[in-house]
Amino acid sequence: MKIFEKIFVILIFVIGIIYVGRDLWGIKFSHYPGDKYDTRFNNVILEHNYRFFRGIEKSYLSAKFFYPAKKSIAGSDHHLFPSLIYSFLRLCGLDMFYSFSLWVLILFLLNYFSSFYILNKSGIDFFLSGIGAFLFSFSLPIMAQTMHIQTLYIFPIPFIFYFLQKFFETNKYKYFLKFFIFFLILYYTSPYFSCLILIPLFFFTITSIIINKEKFLKYIYKDIFLKLITIIVFFILILPFYLVYTKTGDFWGKGHIIKNLPSFIAYMVPFHGSFLYKNFSLYFWKFQTDPWHKEYSFGLITSSILFFYIFKGIKFRDLFPYIITIFLTILIFTKIGNFSLYSFILEIKIFRKAQAVWRYYHILLFPIIFSSLKSIQRYTLNFKLRNFIYIFLLISVLIENFPLRNSMKNTPILEIKNAHKDLEEVVKLKRKKEHKCFVVILPDSLKGKNIKVDLVSTMIVYQNLNFPTINGYTTFSPKGYNMWDEPTWQDVINWLKYNGWEDEKIESKVLKIYFDGEKYY
């Protein structure tokens, strides 16, 4: 690239970081991206992985929360692959909270430059590739999910689609292998995305086979042995996590999942978060349950331009699989009233593990961006006002995706660093040699008073003191566990008896820490 092109690409990245950074980290990097619960829980999982790599934790799957349950890590996204980045930051001497904050910044960097690389490698010029990378990394749909940091880990997705397309176009084994490598990377990070991506990949594969039918049938047996070995190794590598994931916790009901799907209007109108639409978008809230989480629009103008050129691009052979995938996937995941075609997908029970199905759109971002920008480039190739269209698109993207102040959650990092300290001091003070674990509970008299135990703090204390906790926080709790916001001693007894503990062992081996809403004792 020429020097101007490099400056432009970096400048767009810096603008994106400013957009998300003023809320997530603050000007002085004094804030923690997210809240004290979901976000800090992801931090705990990354810390567990780091501790396992260091040899502090003896089991990867069985972290010592929800004690004495086994395979507690499988209750949510396990972050195995991205924890390598986090672990490097920890080894550099940063504490778990600053490591996490910097890790989030690196995720944005990975998303931006990986998507830019694939877009540009696919023949899209640097200007449109920069715009596309911005939309993939910093647009409203991404900002709407920043409290759920695990949804930011999407950098493998452009590679997955790119290598799958290249395989069907060339029938070369190297693309087949690279597709499975990047799918494995995604799988070792997020069961959510690796499950939901199966639907668009199914449509993409079927469409690609149809349009490349003659070539596909001619070379179907080429490198067949290597392909079979690759598939077998892939399934061997995913099977342990898959079996644990399906057997942990309960499955969501169909009605609960369908309720969380988006309506069609979500794809065009920003519901929340855009400075430009801060008053206009409120009118449309009544059309969508929990609208901020169903933010799929890049802005009314930007979305209109992108989908207009997606429609126009359907005549291009290389874009056809992407475009069919986009519309069929949207059709599957979008509800009309209380009905959605996704209800038929839910007959496959593994899909009931995904409650937050609205996150599927993160997977579809790349196909939408790729096919629309490729179409724009082709239709404006000999157009005199091409530069005007490019600049207009850039301006609309930057203005429509400029976020409202405080539209993304953050917490002062000192508050995060101190949130568990009082509990940790009490546990250290009361701990005795005979104790095998600790639990934070409410006095019976406070049950039903809406006093919530900070469950994530109990997990951090367990990690700091290497002292197992019966408390825990995750998407899917272990079977038999019923100790969430207002746990009492009877809940503890029920849980431990479910795991085969006798009364005497329960009384002697468990350190009880009470919480009255203000202090631990």
List the model feature ranges, each with a label.
Residues K36-F41, L237-F308:
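Periplasmic/ER-lumenal interhelical loops and adjacent helix-loop junctions
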Residues L228-I232, L319, F370, K374-F402:
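Signature aromatic-anchored transmembrane alpha helix within multi-pass, membrane-resident enzymes
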Residues M1-W25, I220-V233, R317-Y322, Y521:
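Start-transfer (signal-anchor) and selected internal transmembrane alpha helices
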